[in-house]
């Protein structure tokens, strides 16, 4: 691990184009920033030739993702399917250099009535259909992942129903491509980040996104505050201001300092991109985000839902009759192997009070 202060120094150098001396713990720095999907940006900070490979690799990934985005646009326009690009495909355009904002996958929203047609035309174009979640379907092509959304969240009615009708907030770009209005886009990004924190956790990258988003002089902070109140995320919005203020300095809007900021920042650094770095304990994040007994949580974690079981044991997708056998395998693994999940849950008990303090203050305990 590296300290909060060192992380802050590196991030400040990234956004303000400063060059730092290569530290003695450069291997630790590289590992942390790999976990955060930010390692490619270290080359501009240290100008160390050993880091150039990450920088060059990022440009290749960016071009490949660009090609996929252009292909998706063509496919949906040719088949008269309305669509909205989500998340990183939009956010990267506000970065000084677009390729600096990498994406784990490409997210696209279509109208619910078009989901079957969209699936069909993608498969016809060589996209391999994967797992179907409640709100999106996964596709893969050329080792890249696309998520085809028909809803923005698994439960569209959460966040007080704010995201039930996203197309009412859509503005036409050209042909069949649409985009969200600015406020709705920001609200979606805030709620999406909150979802990750209530799940396995989230890392630094979204806060860099918000730093660039909120540094636009046209941002209507009063409107953002009012909309955040509507979805119950006013405290979480305030916490975002605190974090980008800590890392980069931020004076575009007044915000209330939070008591557990250092713990909050440490959790973010430990989490990695989506809570699965070696130093992260996503069970502590999950347990902190829910007001339920440890016993109930322990049972839920060790005996996952049917949906999660299918991810852990892919053969269930093809042979659902083997579900009882998969349950037996899971129970035996927990009892006799002392699995990674068990170890993480035990460690979570030590971390939980710190996490609860943070989650209470940022408004994500439910």
Residue ranges and their predicted role:
Residues 1-104, 110-366:
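Conserved NTP-donor binding/palm subdomain of two-metal-ion nucleotidyltransferases/polymerases, i.e.
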């Amino acid at each position: 691990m590296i300290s909060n202060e060192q992380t802050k120094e590196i991030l400040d150098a990234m956004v303000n184009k400063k060059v730092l001396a290569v530290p003695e713990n450069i291997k630790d720095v590289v590992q942390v920033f790999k976990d955060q999907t930010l390692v490619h940006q270290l080359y501009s900070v240290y100008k160390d030739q050993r880091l150039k490979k990450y920088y060059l690799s990022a440009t290749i990934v960016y071009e490949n993702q660009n090609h996929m985005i252009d292909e998706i646009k063509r496919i949906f326009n040719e088949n008269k399917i309305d669509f909205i690009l989500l998340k990183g495909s939009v956010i990267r355009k506000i970065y000084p250099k677009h390729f600096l904002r990498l994406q784990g996958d490409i997210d696209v929203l279509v109208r619910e009535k078009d989901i079957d047609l969209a699936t069909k035309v993608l498969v016809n174009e060589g996209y391999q259909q994967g797992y179907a979640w409640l709100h999106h379907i996964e596709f893969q092509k050329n080792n890249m992942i696309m998520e085809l959304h028909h809803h923005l969240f698994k439960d569209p009615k959460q966040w007080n129903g704010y995201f039930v009708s996203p197309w009412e907030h859509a503005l036409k770009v050209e042909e069949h491509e649409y985009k969200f209005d600015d406020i709705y886009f920001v609200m979606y990004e805030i709620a999406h980040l909150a979802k990750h924190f209530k799940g396995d956790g989230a890392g630094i990258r979204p806060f860099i996104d918000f730093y660039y988003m909120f540094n636009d002089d046209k941002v209507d902070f009063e409107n953002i505050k009012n909309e955040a109140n509507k979805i119950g995320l006013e405290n979480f919005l305030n916490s975002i201001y605190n974090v980008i203020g800590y890392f980069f300095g931020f004076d575009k809007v007044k915000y209330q300092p939070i008591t557990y900021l250092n713990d909050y920042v440490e959790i973010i650094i430990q989490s990695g991109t989506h809570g699965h770095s070696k130093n992260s304990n996503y069970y502590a994040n999950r347990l902190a985000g829910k007001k339920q007994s440890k016993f109930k949580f322990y049972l839920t974690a060790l005996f996952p839902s049917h949906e999660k079981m299918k991810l852990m044991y892919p053969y269930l997708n093809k042979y659902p009759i083997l579900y009882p056998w998969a349950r037996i395998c899971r129970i035996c693994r927990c009892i006799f192997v002392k699995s990674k999940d068990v170890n993480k849950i035990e460690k979570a008990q030590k971390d939980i009070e710190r996490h609860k303090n943070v989650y209470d203050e940022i408004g994500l305990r439910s």
